[in-house]
Amino acid sequence: MDLNTLLETTVVGLGYELVDVEMSPRGRTIRVFIDAPAKETGIDVEDCAKVSNQLTRVFEVENFDFDRLEISSPGLDRVVKKAADFERFSGQEIQIKVRIPQGGRRNFQGELLGLKDGKVGLRLAKDDVELEFTNIEKARLVPRFD
């Protein structure tokens, strides 16, 4: 079983959402970002400890070698990757970087309008744009401090 499948199965099985995974260049440190959409208070230390303990056991059973495992909440500027995320965070400020420039630009920031027919809607200062979901390289929420 590959690492991503192992992580997804374990994290979802514990009732959390796997948001993102980062690995150090040599693969010795694994950073796992989890969320609990059903929980109003978000992720806390107990949630991280629960996932860490379970993943450590699973890695031992699967004989997966690593030096360090870090479990964290996705933070205020969380990564937005899955199609469902682009719907869930509709109405929020987002930064998007595309692989292939659109209108001479690769970077966009504006209000997320959602995902429809494979296109992500974005309200910019002057107009609205639609970006191909498959062309998105990276997307992050932009925290607001009002």
From Swiss-Prot:
Record-annotated membrane-spanning stretches: none
Superkingdom classification of source: Bacteria
InterPro entries: Ribosome_maturation_RimP, RimP_C, RimP_C_sf, RimP_N, RimP_N_sf
Subcellular location(s) per record: Cytoplasm
Primary location recorded for the protein, binned into one broad class: cytoplasm
Swiss-Prot/TrEMBL keywords: Cytoplasm, Ribosome biogenesis
GO BP annotations, alphabetical order: ribosomal small subunit assembly; translation
One GO location term (cellular component): cytosol
Gene3D superfamilies named among the record's database cross-references: Ribosome maturation factor RimP, C-terminal domain, RimP-like superfamily, N-terminal
Sequence similarity: Belongs to the RimP family.
Record-linked NCBIfam families: PRK00092.2-1 (NF000929)
Function: Required for maturation of 30S ribosomal subunits.
Entry protein name: Ribosome maturation factor RimP
UniProt source species: Dechloromonas aromatica (strain RCB)
Gene behind this protein: rimP
